[in-house]
């Protein structure tokens, strides 16, 4: 037995060293990734001077004001308003990353665009808090429609990934409050508990929910998950449309803009993905014009 123990000692020691090296490597990787994430989050934010849009805060009684950016194309007539919601897995992202894109689609679609810099789900902030910020922002612009030359009957909510969830959740909450949303666009959106929330609503409210366009990325479980919501909407008589972009990656629409050039996290940014992104924007714009006419 003594000889056996001696033979095992070097093996155990080697295994211990391997585990120690792996543990150190893991810690270093986590620290590096955490540093990069923090650097990316800071790099997403623009100064008011750098912004193309107009930055201001939407006031709320008894609650923190909501941080928004506004994009208004030249128009003598009242126009639809699009609430454009960034992604980031609920814990990252910033409305400023949509700055170039929001300015572009405002001009190309002939619609006002509002990006909502909802609070991220960390440091005690819940995902529902962010949904409430979106809802309150919609209500503010609806109440001040004349001031911004927008049509309060042509409200659109558009979101990507986590912003796609906020789109679905805010649209349902507004319907519960008797506020009509004209259209919702869900781009590879997180589904979470949306189907359960929808099914719990009275039948009349379920049938009155806004028409929905689902933009799907390729080979993306998050995109595919959102189809569960599309199915129940369709079953309740809500107009839906699904557009899948073959070869596209999760995040391809918003990430293919200049704001992502300086970030470490830009997996879906490439010339090929950018072509798909611009096509998707054209598709969304044309779909909205058909819905809003």
Q: Which functions belong to the PLM regions below?
A:
Residues 3-21:
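N-terminal Sec-pathway targeting helices
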Residues 36-76:
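N-terminal cap/lid segment of alpha/beta-hydrolase-fold proteins
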Residues 78-89:
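Short beta-strand element of the alpha/beta-hydrolase
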Residues 94-95, 101-102, 114-152, 275:
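Catalytic nucleophile-loop/oxyanion-hole region of alpha/beta-hydrolase
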Residues 136-198:
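Primarily recognizes the serine-hydrolase "nucleophile elbow" in alpha/beta-hydrolase
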Residues 208, 214-216:
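Short beta-strand/loop motif that positions the catalytic acidic residue
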Residues 221-227:
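Conserved alpha/beta-hydrolase "acid-adjacent" motif
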Residues 239-293:
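C-terminal catalytic histidine-bearing segment of alpha/beta-hydrolase fold enzymes
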